[in-house]
Amino acid sequence: MKPEEIVEGLLSGNRRALARAITYVENEYPESKEIMRQIFAKTGRAHVVGLTGFPGVGKSTLVSKLTEEFRRRGKKVGIIAIDPGSPFTGGALLGDRLRLDGMDSRKQLWTDPGIFFRSMSSRGRAGGLAAKTGDVVRLLDAFGFDVILVETVGAGQSEVDIIEVADTSVVVMMPETGDEIQVNKAGILEIGDIYVVNKADLGGAEKVERWLRYMLSLDEESVQMLSQMTHADEARVQSGEFFERRKGWNPPVIKTVADRGEGIKELADAIEEHFDYMKKTGLIEKRRRERVKRELFEIVMNDVIKLVKEKTNYRDLLVKLLKGETDPYTAAEQIVEEVIHNAGKG
């Protein structure tokens, strides 16, 4: 299919066209850029909600129950679940249907036109997201979903990248996994707009909740010191980026028992309240402006790297580097000069 045919189908509500567009984008087919160009002006209406947390905290069940709750509220829901990639194929290991086990009415939900589910492989990428997550979010947005839920891979590494695609970041924890370690690790004190203590029927839930509320009450200087001690995303914490992005908003802490549906309504309420707050204060425009800037720089960098590989003698310079005949800085300058020179030739 031609890009314009896919876009026409997607914008008219054709789910097959949406699925094909996602496949093109995820696999970086040549047509994908034209698809993204054509749908860009149709985006910016959906509320993108990211759920992140360590393995086993129940993110998938929360996503399932939240989907049910938002559907009850008349919202159309798109779901992106980032799976760990196969080290051999790069493909998602879990697959779409396994991720919806927590839903009560599976048959109905699989045929519900107001729900679309897609799993994506992280392909070994750190940060909890797949490389093309942002583009797939835009496709779901253009299709007309009201809420887009993005569930990170949950591999235990720093997953602060969720803030690069989400309007609202939900950090999920659970008891009996070392509450202080959970709270101190991976910059999660800085990235969350909402915090969830799931599996709250287990012992220790109140302790996690108290500790979390205490840590969230600390001032910016204290958290910056904490980030140094815990090896969080220190550069971004020290820059004040995380605090600036939620200034004026006090993150709530919500206890849930997702597999029984307890606390789901309160969580959905908090998610909607946060979205309303951002729209009212102008924070949503600020976050999205930063997101577009990062995206622009990433596209430029990818295109420049492609030019370097195609239009310069970087391989010869690599050989010289390995022989000690030049240094990385001089080699980089030569590559930049080559790129500029070749660009001037048209």
From Swiss-Prot:
May have GTPase activity. May also bind and hydrolyze ATP. May function as chaperone. GTP binds at residues 53-61, 201, 257-259. This is Putative GTPase AF_1289. InterPro entries: GTPase/Isobutyryl-CoA_mutase, GTPase_ArgK, P-loop_NTPase. Gene3D superfamilies: 1.20.5.170, P-loop containing nucleotide triphosphate hydrolases. One of its GO terms (molecular function) is GTPase activity. Keywords: ATP-binding, Chaperone, GTP-binding, Hydrolase, Nucleotide-binding. Belongs to the SIMIBI class G3E GTPase family. ArgK/MeaB subfamily. Its EC number is 3.6.-.-. Pfam families: MeaB.
